[in-house]
């Protein structure tokens, strides 16, 4: 058994916490969405279940017919993920939903087929139309409440708040310059503003007294003594003062008490008054009460409606239904659990489950928000404005949630159709059933649209395992409901203090998307509300415990967090009284007694790919960014080699990316070949785990996916052991490049501008050779003119050209092909119009003949050559045209298949019985087991399970068994559920195989008779023009391949394999590459592998010690000798081992030439670009260069016959054919275009011939 090489490290202690599963973001989210494996009654109100419960029940307009949702059921996939890719179909399961319909004729229940739903593979990807895709998680502004401030042109600071729901209208409240608060509903309608006081009344606070009571505490004061009188002057009334007899109003609520008013009140014999404590005439609420044009609930509602819908009659019914619809109808306005959580947290409301389930707006929310806004305006220290770029105010929508939102809109469409069908149904002629009124089209089309067209559903980057892993961990601020890259400012893109341990500050693309597309940090998790959490060790009484606490960004604000590098003694206490810590996003030297938490690892700051860069702490951030991005572009090599200098993350990255095969359980390897590994389970050797290996498959980016076994028969394996290597892995570790002996020196000017010089030895050893696989596809269809045919018999093609084609017209496997060679021969019927006049005449005389077909063969495109490695043919079988022999053969195949199916089913039953026996035999039942439908007691509580009872349970399905919750029931459920799924899968496989034997490939597109896929593999060696890079952002292009004899060599005669330019180091400030060179040299000489984890790597002194130990020069520099002359170079040169990668930007894909080719339709100028077989544009500046040298004839040629002079092109062709060399140019087409454009403007411009 191959074991991963143990890496030497200087870390004294391993990380307290292991990395979480790196693709958990995807898998967990989709699992919660579908809740596969759960019984219908056990499903929580989340994901797909939540959407169905939201939309249903649907009632007809007269409420006589009601359609209720009961449960949904998911089938099993028809094909495996690999088979789906091969056939070009979607990896999905059927969705069946059980409905109950109640109408005047009674109650009917029915299970309705609602189409298919794509499911996720074990690796966290989807297969849509045969291509692997990833749904990227979206970062968006969290629903909830945000308080903001902006400066008015007059210099005043104006405060505002915004309540953002998950779905529905935004509510905004803004202070104006006069200290009045105005409410805006939906940002689009900013001009329609409503005074906050009017809005409060419209919510149901009718009188001024009610409003004052909400905002102020009210005190009752007596008016008996003179000192009471004096104390009340200037206070604000909290209620109207009314004469009980005459109903005369002496003072209104909200009015300021003057001496005159108090005398009138005293004269009327009023004994006490209600006073608003803390209110004065300048208080915003009192000001707004005075300004408010309305005085009652009804008037406020009408005013609100008038401002919202000017021009429409403001009736009370309309106004009330509008406000209800805007904020109090859960279908139209939904804060979501997240929005409610954020709002309650900010305003100090309770956070229990009951409160969090209230998803619409409450009156208390508006009042609470206005109170907070006023406190903010008054300068209360306990209030604060929100930073919208803080991760407490930004959340992540993962796959499950994104698809849930699309399902909601699909089912909402269906709801309208169902309601219409209910109303239009003719009950007299037919009975109504759920299947007759439900249309699954809405849901299916929305899902199809999302997976194939959404900006967040992306074609997976599959260049290498790291690219795949990073793509699944990516966070995007773009996409529907997100930002727009043109409008996104600097603040959104910038690194924020709250990103620490949540979003990687380094890994982001260069260019327009910088900062908008980011990556999750290595330890980050996403919580139930969608906020990113990061783990910390809890510190209690100065002792750093092993207790781990996951914290969101807002919780972290209140904690003092020490760095992971802080030194601890053997009792896990801080060694020093002061250490570096963070508090509210600022770093400072903290007293260790105040520290509350500690980082779990220094690498929690960065993402996985950035964590793969050794000596990251010595690299400039810009170069580290390039290093992270370029590791994703490394091509998997033919011969892989793990890095001598690693960081310790290589094994984990390879494992979680799904590139390698890992043992699921302990056991012994029983059988190994290049296609399959069989492991007998340790606890029950009769049960086998079978692992299928992927052999020479094409990845999304054309690279080769191939897995090779690492184990041998008889090897004992434990859970998590590596059984097989994949692409770009070496003994279970990531291996993207090669360890190369490098010298930093100039060499005859060939490494100018970062160019790289390599030794021919690397080419001979196939060090940087990679395999590319191209897929070519051809379909034969049934056309109007007749059937297309795949055949070897192609008109007007010599036998020599057809040499590699088999009898069926398909190229043989192993054939070497080059551009223009035929891969699949195909003939298509010709239409009459395509025939030449003489052909038509001949056909009229001699009648129909075989030549009425044209050649439509698939040929190798330019720039591609290689070996045909695989051919796949899919075809339909015609039931009616089968011969007797074929029917007999079919019957034999079906019989064999049935036999195999029965034996596998029997094996499953045996395994199932053994599992049940292992769990239950001779055990005591902790609770009774009841049959759900018949209510019979199958097993009494306390009974001992014997063989008979186990056989009884074995025959029952999981749905029918009922037992009180206990550990035994949980395990029993798992066993029954996995057995039922296995039986279902076996049955589906049997039916699929039987269908294939009878009908061939029935899932081909409509009209397709036959489909052929040809795979051509090409071996690409490293050549001049290929791009290479190290892990520190040090990239360059291969400029020269030097014979080994000419390369500089060391004193011991060893030649250098690569020469890099030393000037690439100082200005780029990526010193990591130099340290890697030294450490790599020392480790290679010692024959060890080392790991230098991010921020806790080898110190410089330790590297020098290792160099000296290995007898290498102390300064890391050696004298080199020129391979050409044998003379020693003057200065010492840094020599050592660097891990260099070959990137996917290969010159073979980019180099291009054209003699003649296609021309643009309008301008008649050659097209541009390799894909269009375009030319090289000779632009304005190039013309100036030729003009400067006065090369008139060349200029004329370039601007006319080589470009858009149509008649001149024809004439020059004729003259070249005749052997003349005459250039008679005509009018360039661009001149005619100019004239037409001017005529389009109404100018009569015509070229005229004028006699001289």
Swiss-Prot record:
* Family matches, as PANTHER family: DNA-DIRECTED RNA POLYMERASE I SUBUNIT 2 (PTHR20856)
Question: One GO molecular function term?
Answer: DNA-directed RNA polymerase activity
Q: Does the keyword Transcription apply?
A: yes
Please provide the record's keywords in A-Z order.
DNA-directed RNA polymerase, Nucleotidyltransferase, Transcription, Transferase
Q: What is its EC number?
A: 2.7.7.6
Superkingdom to which the source organism belongs: Bacteria
The major lineage groups are: Bacteria, Pseudomonadati, Chlamydiota, Chlamydiia, Chlamydiales
Record-stated family: Belongs to the RNA polymerase beta chain family.
What is the designated name of this protein? DNA-directed RNA polymerase subunit beta
Coiled-coil residue windows: none
Q: How does it assemble?
A: The RNAP catalytic core consists of 2 alpha, 1 beta, 1 beta' and 1 omega subunit. When a sigma factor is associated with the core the holoenzyme is formed, which can initiate transcription.
Q: What does this protein do?
A: DNA-dependent RNA polymerase catalyzes the transcription of DNA into RNA using the four ribonucleoside triphosphates as substrates.
A biological process (GO) annotation for this entry?
A: DNA-templated transcription
One GO cellular component term, please give it: DNA-directed RNA polymerase complex
Tell me the enzyme class: transferase
Q: Which reaction does it catalyse?
A: RNA(n) + a ribonucleoside 5'-triphosphate = RNA(n+1) + diphosphate
Instruction: Please provide an example of a Pfam family that matches this protein in its UniProt record.
Output: RNA_pol_Rpb2_3
Question: What Gene3D superfamilies does this protein map onto?
Answer: 2.40.50.100, 2.40.50.150, 3.90.1100.10, DNA-directed RNA polymerase, subunit 2, domain 6 (2.40.270.10), RNA polymerase alpha subunit dimerisation domain (3.90.1800.10), RNA polymerase Rpb2, domain 2 (3.90.1110.10)
């Amino acid at each position: 058994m191959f074991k991963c090489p143990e890496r030497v490290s200087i870390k004294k202690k391993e990380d307290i916490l292991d990395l979480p599963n790196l693709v958990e973001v995807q898998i967990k989210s989709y699992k919660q969405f579908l809740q596969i494996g759960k019984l219908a009654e056990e499903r929580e109100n989340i994901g797909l279940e939540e959407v169905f419960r939201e939309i249903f029940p649907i009632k007809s307009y007269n409420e006589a017919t009601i359609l209720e949702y009961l449960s949904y059921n998911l089938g099993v996939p028809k094909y495996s993920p690999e088979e789906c890719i091969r056939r070009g179909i979607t990896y999905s399961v059927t969705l069946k939903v059980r409905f109950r319909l109640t109408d005047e004729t009674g109650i009917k229940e029915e299970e309705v087929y609602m189409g298919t739903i794509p499911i996720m593979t074990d690796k966290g990807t989807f297969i849509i139309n045969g291509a692997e895709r990833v749904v990227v998680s979206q970062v968006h502004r969290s629903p909830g409440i945000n308080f903001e401030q902006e400066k008015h042109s007059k210099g005043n600071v104006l405060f505002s708040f915004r309540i953002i729901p998950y779905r529905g209208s935004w509510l905004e409240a803004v202070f104006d310059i006069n200290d009045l608060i105005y409410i805006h509903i939906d940002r689009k309608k900013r001009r329609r503003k409503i005074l906050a006081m009017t809005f409060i009344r419209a919510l149901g606070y009718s009188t001024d007294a009610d409003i004052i009571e909400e905002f102020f505490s009210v005190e009752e004061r007596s008016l008996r003594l003179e000192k009471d009188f004096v104390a009340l002057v200037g206070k604000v009334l909290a209620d109207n003062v009314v004469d009980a007899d005459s109903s005369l109003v002496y003072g209104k609520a909200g009015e300021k008490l003057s001496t005159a008013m108090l005398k009138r009140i005293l004269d009327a014999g009023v004994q006490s008054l209600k006073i608003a404590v803390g209110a004065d005439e300048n208080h915003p609420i009192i000001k707004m009460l005075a300004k408010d044009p309305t005085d009652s609930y009804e008037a406020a509602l009408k005013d609100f409606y008038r401002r919202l819908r000017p021009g429409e009659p403001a009736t009370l019914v309309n106004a009330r239904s509008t406000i209800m619809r805007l904020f109090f109808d859960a279908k139209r306005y939904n804060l979501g659990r997240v929005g409610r959580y954020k709002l309650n947290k900010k305003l100090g409301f309770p956070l229990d489950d009951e409160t969090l389930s209230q998803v619409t707006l409450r009156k208390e929310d508006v009042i609470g928000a206005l109170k907070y806004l006023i406190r903010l305006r008054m300068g209360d220290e306990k209030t604060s404005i929100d930073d919208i770029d803080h991760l407490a105010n930004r959340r992540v929508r993962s796959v499950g949630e994104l698809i849930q939102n699309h399902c909601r809109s699909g089912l909402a469409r269906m709801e309208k159709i169902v309601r219409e069908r209910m109303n239009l149904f003719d009950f007299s002629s037919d009975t109504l059933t759920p299947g007759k009124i439900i249309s699954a089209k809405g849901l299916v089309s929305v899902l199809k649209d999302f997976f194939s067209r959404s900006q967040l559903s992306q074609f997976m980057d599959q260049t290498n395992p790291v690219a795949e892993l990073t793509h699944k961990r990516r966070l995007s601020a773009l996409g529907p409901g997100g930002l727009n890259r043109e409008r996104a400012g600097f603040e959104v893109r910038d690194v924020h203090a709250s990103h620490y341990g949540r979003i990687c500050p380094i890994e982001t693309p260069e260019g327009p998307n910088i900062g908008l597309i980011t990556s999750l940090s290595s330890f980050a998790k996403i919580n139930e509300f969608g906020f990113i959490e990061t783990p910390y060790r809890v510190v209690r009484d100065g002792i750093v415990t092993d207790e781990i606490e996951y914290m969101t960004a807002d919780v972290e604000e209140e904690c003092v967090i020490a760095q992971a590098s802080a030194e601890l003694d053997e009792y896990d206490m801080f060694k020093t009284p002061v250490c570096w810590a963070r508090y509210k996003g600022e770093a400072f030297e903290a007293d260790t007694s105040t520290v509350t938490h500690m980082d779990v690892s220094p690498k929690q700051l960065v993402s996985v790919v950035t964590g793969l860069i050794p000596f990251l702490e010595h690299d400039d951030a810009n170069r580290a960014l390039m290093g992270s991005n370029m590791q994703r572009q490394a091509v998997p090599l033919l011969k892989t080699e793990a890095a001598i200098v690693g960081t310790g993350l290589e094994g984990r990255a390879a494992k979680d990316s799904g590139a390698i095969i890992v043992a699921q359980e302990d056991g012994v390897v029983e059988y190994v070949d290049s296609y399959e590994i069989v492991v007998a389970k340790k606890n029950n050797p009769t049960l086998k785990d079978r692992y299928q290996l992927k052999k020479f498959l094409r990845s999304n980016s054309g690279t080769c996916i191939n897995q090779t076994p690492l184990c041998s028969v008889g090897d004992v394996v434990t859970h998590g052991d590596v059984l097989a290597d994949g692409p770009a892995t070496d003994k279970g570790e990531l291996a993207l490049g090669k360890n190369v002996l490098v010298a930093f020196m100039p060499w005859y000017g060939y490494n100018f501008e970062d160019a790289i010089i390599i030794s021919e030895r690397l080419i001979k050893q196939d060090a940087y050779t990679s395999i590319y696989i191209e897929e070519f596809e051809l379909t034969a269809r049934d056309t109007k003119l007749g059937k297309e045919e795949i055949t070897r018999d192609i008109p007007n093609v010599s036998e020599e050209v057809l040499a590699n084609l088999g009898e069926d017209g398909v190229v043989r496997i192993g054939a070497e092909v080059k551009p223009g060679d035929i891969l699949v021969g195909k003939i298509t019927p010709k239409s009459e119009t395509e025939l030449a006049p003489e052909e038509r005449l001949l056909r009229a005389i001699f009648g129909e003949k075989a030549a009425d077909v044209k050649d439509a063969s698939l040929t190798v495109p330019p720039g591609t050559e290689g070996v045909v490695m695989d051919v796949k043919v899919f075809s339909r079988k015609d039931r009616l045209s089968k011969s007797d022999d074929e029917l007999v053969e079919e019957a034999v195949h079906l019989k064999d298949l049935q036999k195999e199916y029965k034996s596998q089913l029997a094996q499953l039953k045996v395994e199932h019985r053994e599992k049940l026996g292992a769990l239950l035999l001779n055990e005591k039942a902790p609770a009774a087991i009841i049959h759900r439908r018949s209510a019979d007691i199958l097993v009494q509580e306390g009974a001992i399970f014997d063989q008979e009872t186990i056989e009884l349970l074995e025959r029952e399905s999981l749905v029918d068994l009922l037992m009180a919750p206990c550990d035994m029931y949980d395990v029993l459920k798992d066993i029954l559920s996995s057995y039922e799924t296995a039986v279902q899968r076996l049955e589906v496989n049997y039916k699929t195989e039987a269908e294939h034997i009878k009908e061939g490939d029935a899932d081909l597109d409509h009209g397709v008779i036959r489909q052929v896929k040809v795979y051509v593999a090409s071996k690409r060696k490293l050549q001049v023009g290929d791009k290479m890079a190290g892990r520190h952002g040090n990239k360059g292009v291969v400029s020269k391949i030097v014979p080994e004899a000419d390369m500089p060599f060391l004193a011991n005669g060893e030649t250098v394999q690569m020469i890099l330019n030393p000037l690439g180091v100082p200005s780029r400030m990526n010193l990591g590459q130099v340290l890697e060179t030294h450490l790599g040299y020392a480790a290679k000489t010692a024959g060890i592998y080392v790991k230098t984890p991010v921020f806790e790597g080898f110190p410089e002194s330790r590297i020098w010690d290792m160099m000296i130990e290995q007898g290498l020069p102390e300064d890391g520099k050696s004298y080199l000798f020129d391979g050409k002359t044998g003379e020693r170079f003057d200065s010492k040169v840094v020599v050592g081992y660097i891990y260099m990668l070959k990137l996917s930007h290969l010159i073979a894909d980019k180099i291009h030439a054209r003699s003649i080719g296609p021309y643009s339709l309008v301008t008649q100028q050659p097209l541009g670009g390799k894909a269009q077989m375009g030319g090289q544009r000779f632009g304005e500046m190039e013309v100036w260069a030729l003009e400067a040298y006065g090369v008139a004839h060349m200029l004329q040629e370039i601007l006319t016959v080589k470009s858009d002079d149509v008649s001149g092109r024809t004439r020059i062709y004729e003259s070249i054919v005749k052997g003349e060399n005459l250039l008679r140019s005509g009018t360039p087409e661009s001149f005619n275009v100019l004239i037409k454009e001017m005529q389009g403007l109404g100018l009569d411009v015509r070229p005229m011939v004028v006699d001289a």
